[in-house]
């Protein structure tokens, strides 16, 4: 078969691609390492309805399922995002990073997963497992690696090497069966290289290979994976299926079901399964539709990786499957599954001692010799078909190092750390570290960092609910959400089907906004609008002794705004006009309302969040210049540009320069220690301001005003900016200065100070109510 790829550049490229999907199980635990007995987090909805986040056997055993992707990078990003979403939504709990369980309660207290109805088939199946195998063994967790070759690759090979009168599906079945056969023979190598469950609590399992660790936990003396050993999660007795043909494979499983050995194909706990995408997953469905992908079930959770698996491990497994496709039939044992099982168990229980294996002729061969034989073949086909790919060769070299030096295996490293720290403490420390890493980047959707932060937030919240998300226009932050037959189109997180087009036009035009609000007795600042800069300049005498705001007529985010609270010159006024007219063809000059500016986020006639916005500022230290202080403050990892992070970097543009000049300062001025220097008069977070949550503290009086303003304009998702007087006695002197039809949500979700609000959830509730 190798020659087919050497002769065809297109097939060579396709060989190293594929379709990938991952399923990962983690147990939810309390902060002291005990099985969490809380229900599955409600935000994820019914398990039957969420395609991404379900439970495995136990209510406490969460399962994350990626969609099928076309690269290892993208499937890894999906898994990372799901892990982060689940971690952040599992309040006061952690995700246990090991395949072997945490501290467990009595068998009868381990909760089986709950479903919509007590007689759900999923519930009944789990009750069957609990009765047949016990609950504790069901809590062994791991990763399932789903893979299929590109259809174009199958087509190309079918044209070249199919048998006479062989249908394409029969050919496809034969190829996948061949890969599965290679996997079954050589899976011991995969367990040696990826196994990560050699340690466990003493009351969970006992084998003749046990040794006690200092904390009282147990370890396989030279073992690699309890989960993949005979003491792990296996069928009650060995089930050998016939890999010589697809029909024989189907017949084998059917016979075991008819004999009552297993209830259904779901209970066939083979390390690799042939599957199709039909949801019933019955043997009859597989027989009818044929093989569509392979499911590898023997991958342990790697406690040394926050995601439970590394990209290199994913890439190596892919190479392992490619090797199966390229293998010659003579390389495969003639259906000697018992020998393959013995090799698997031997490595799982004794792999670090590198015991001798049995080859197809039942002769002993060293682990190193057998492993290097396969790894060298992988290296050879990479060199032959993809010589420029040094990364893949490096992955193979890493596996060789583990083979030659057992102490470098994942299992050996885990055992060493557990011996040092203790079983529970090590895994808890890992879980806490991973949680801290997740929390530090909680605002982020991996792989969507180029999109606005508010878009990333609502996308993550949609995933949590099992809502399908399609990116329609990445540059425009335009998404489609689908839950069942319900479809919603959303742009920039808050432009939705609930918007009234005329309402948007009114809010876009600040003059119209003020007129309409004033007509409904809602207080707004008085002022004039100008479309001619010369006429606006001539009006200087009307404003020179007043506190004023100069701003563009139709912009958001505080761009182009200048505020004069103190005496200003004609030159200052002219510069403010220059700035405002650079953003719009018309500007507004209006009275300045004293007080503090607050953003009220109103969704469907309810104030969901209130934010106090502090203008962009720096605090002096008596040493550094204003410019240097700005540069230092901008190094905060939570500050970015273009709404990609919770806070915006402070700019050093004309608006900030003007603000400094109004204070008789420049960028080279050195403020005194603890002296606060404001770089902006307007307090928009979008221009570098700081955000402080005030939702609970805000007087309901002003919340009602915000709601009334949105009702006047028939705005359903709206940011209302209100100047609130500092003295309660003056509250009637408030004023609405702006209504925003596309309010940013990220500043409420991740404020500089105060409680984080789940605004994405609120918008999704509104859209899918």
Curated annotation (Swiss-Prot):
Keyword vocabulary terms for this entry: ATP-binding, Glutathione biosynthesis, Ligase, Magnesium, Manganese, Metal-binding, Multifunctional enzyme, Nucleotide-binding
Cofactor comment: Binds 2 magnesium or manganese ions per subunit.
Enzyme Commission code(s) on record: 6.3.2.2, 6.3.2.3
Stretches for region Glutamate--cysteine ligase: 1-347
SUPFAM superfamilies, per the entry: Glutamine synthetase/guanido kinase, Glutathione synthetase ATP-binding domain-like
Catalytic activity: L-cysteine + L-glutamate + ATP = gamma-L-glutamyl-L-cysteine + ADP + phosphate + H(+); gamma-L-glutamyl-L-cysteine + glycine + ATP = glutathione + ADP + phosphate + H(+)
Binding site for Mg(2+) 1: 721, 738
GO molecular function, one term: glutathione synthase activity
Residues bound to Mn(2+) 1: 721, 738
Function: Synthesizes glutathione from L-glutamate and L-cysteine via gamma-L-glutamyl-L-cysteine.
Name this polypeptide is given: Glutathione biosynthesis bifunctional protein GshAB
Annotated source species: Listeria monocytogenes serotype 4b (strain F2365)
Lineage: Bacteria, Bacillati, Bacillota, Bacilli, Bacillales
């Amino acid at each position: 078969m190798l020659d087919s790829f050497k002769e065809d550049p297109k097939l060579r490229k396709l060989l190293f691609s594929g379709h990938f999907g991952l399923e990962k199980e983690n147990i939810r635990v309390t902060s002291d390492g005990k099985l969490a007995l809380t229900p599955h987090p409600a935000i994820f909805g019914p398990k039957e309805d969420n395609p991404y986040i379900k439970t495995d056997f136990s209510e406490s055993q969460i399962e994350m399922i990626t969609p099928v992707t076309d690269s290892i990078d993208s499937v890894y990003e999906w898994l990372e995002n799901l892990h982060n979403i689940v971690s952040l939504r599992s309040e006061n709990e952690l995700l246990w990073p090991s395949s072997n369980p945490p501290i467990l309660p009595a068998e009868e207290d381990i909760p089986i997963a709950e479903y919509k109805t007590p007689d759900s088939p999923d519930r009944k199946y789990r009750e069957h497992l609990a009765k047949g195998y016990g609950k504790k063994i069901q809590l062994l967790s791991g990763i399932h690696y789903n893979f299929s070759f590109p259809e174009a690759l199958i087509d190309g090979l079918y044209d070249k090497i199919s048998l006479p009168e062989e249908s394409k599906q029969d050919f496809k079945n034969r190829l996948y069966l061949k890969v599965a056969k290679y996997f079954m023979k050589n899976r011991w190598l995969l367990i040696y290289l990826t196994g990560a469950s050699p340690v466990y609590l003493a009351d969970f399992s006992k084998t003749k290979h046990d040794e006690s660790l200092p904390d009282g936990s147990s370890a396989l003396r030279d073992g690699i994976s309890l989960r993949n050993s005979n003491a792990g999660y296996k069928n009650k007795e060995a089930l050998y299926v016939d890999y010589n043909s697809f029909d024989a494979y189907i017949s084998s499983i059917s016979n075991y079901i008819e004999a009552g050995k297993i209830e259904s194909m779901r209970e066939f706990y083979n390390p690799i399964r042939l599957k199709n995408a039909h949801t019933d997953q019955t043997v009859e469905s597989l027989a009818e539709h044929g093989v569509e992908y392979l499911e590898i079930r023997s991958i342990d959770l790697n406690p040394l990786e926050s995601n439970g698996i590394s990209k290199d491990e994913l890439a190596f497994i892919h190479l392992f499957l490619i090797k199966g496709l390229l293998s010659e039939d003579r390389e495969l044992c003639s259906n000697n599954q018992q020998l393959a099982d013995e090799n698997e168990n031997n490595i799982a229980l004794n792999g670090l001692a590198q015991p001798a294996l049995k080859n197809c002729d039942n002769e002993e061969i060293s682990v190193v010799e057998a492993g290097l034989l396969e790894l060298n073949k992988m290296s050879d086909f990479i060199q032959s078909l993809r010589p420029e790919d040094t990364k893949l060769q490096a992955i193979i070299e890493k596996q060789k190092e583990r083979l030659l030096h057992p102490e470098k295996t994942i299992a050996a490293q885990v055992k060493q750390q557990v011996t040092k720290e203790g079983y529970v403490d090590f895994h808890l420390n890992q879980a806490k570290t991973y949680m801290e890493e997740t929390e530090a980047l909680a605002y982020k959707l991996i792989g969507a960092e180029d999109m606005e932060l508010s878009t990333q937030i609502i996308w993550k919240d949609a995933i949590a609910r099992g809502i399908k998300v399609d990116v329609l226009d990445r540059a425009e932050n335009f998404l489609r959400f689908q839950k069942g037959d319900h479809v919603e189109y959303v742009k920039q997180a808050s432009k939705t089907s609930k918007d009234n087009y005329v309402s948007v036009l009114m809010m876009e035009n600040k003059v119209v906004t003020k007129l309409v609000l004033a007509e409904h007795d809602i207080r707004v600042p008085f002022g004039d609008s100008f479309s001619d800069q010369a006429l606006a300049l001539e009006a200087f005498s009307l404003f020179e002794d007043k506190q004023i705001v100069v701003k563009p007529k139709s912009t958001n985010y505080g761009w182009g705004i200048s505020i004069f609270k103190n005496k200003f010159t004609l030159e200052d006024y002219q510069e403010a006009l220059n700035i405002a007219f650079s953003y719009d063809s018309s500007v507004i000059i209006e009275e300045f309302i004293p007080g503090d500016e607050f953003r009220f986020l109103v969704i469907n006639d309810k104030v969901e969040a209130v934010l106090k916005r502090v203008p962009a500022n720096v605090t002096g230290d008596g040493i550094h210049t204003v410019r240097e202080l700005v540069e230092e403050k901008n190094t905060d990892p939570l500050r970015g540009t273009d709404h990609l992070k919770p806070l915006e970097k402070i700019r050093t543009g004309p608006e900030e320069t003007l603000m400094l000049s109004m204070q008789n300062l420049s960028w080279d001025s050195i403020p005194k220690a603890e002296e606060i220097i404001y770089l902006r008069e307007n307090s928009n977070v979008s221009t570098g301001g700081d955000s402080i949550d005030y939702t609970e503290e805000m007087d309901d009086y002003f919340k009602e005003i915000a709601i009334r303003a949105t009702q006047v304009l028939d705005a359903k998702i709206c940011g209302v900016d209100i100047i609130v007087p500092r003295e309660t006695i003056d509250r009637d002197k408030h004023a609405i200065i702006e209504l925003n039809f596309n309010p940013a949500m990220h500043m409420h979700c991740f404020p500089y100070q105060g409680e984080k609000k789940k605004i994405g959830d609120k918008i999704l509730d509104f859209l899918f109510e």
